Structure formats: structure tokens, C-alpha cells
Amino acid sequence: MPTVDENFVKRIQPHSEEAERSVLGSMLMDRDAIVEAEDILTKEDFYQRQYGIVFEAMVELYREGKAVDLITLQNKLKEKQR
């Protein structure tokens, strides 16, 4: 019989891909959304690892005073892969 800890590990954490995509989309469209999201979220809050990486890159661009758009985001993500 599984222990409580084993049952906990097997359980999938609640998440919503749609909500995660909506947050990222809002951040692309509105710099104020970046400020709001940064105040309450970290990359670890995203269930989808890749969404957390995108979130982190967007916040970094914002902190660097750069435009946050598809081109700068793509370049930042490529830079982070190196």
C-alpha cells in the first residue's frame, strides 16, 4: 500500500496552460502587465518549464529597458541558450 508521500508525488499539480499563455500574451502586449506579473510570479510558478523560461526572458528585457516584443524575445531566448 502506497504511503502518503508516494501518493503526493504521483499527484499532478493543478495548472492551466491557457492561463499561463494568457499571462505571457498580456506581458507582450502591455508593459504594465510585466510589472504586475513580476510582482507576483516567478519562473518556477509556471507548470510548463518553457513558459517559465519565456517569462524570465521577458522580465530580463524589461529590466534592461529594452522593448519586449517577439523579435527581442526571440533574440533573448537564443542568447540564453548559449
Regions found by a protein language model. Name each.
Residues 1-82:
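Noncatalytic partner-interaction/assembly domains of nucleic-acid and motor enzyme complexes
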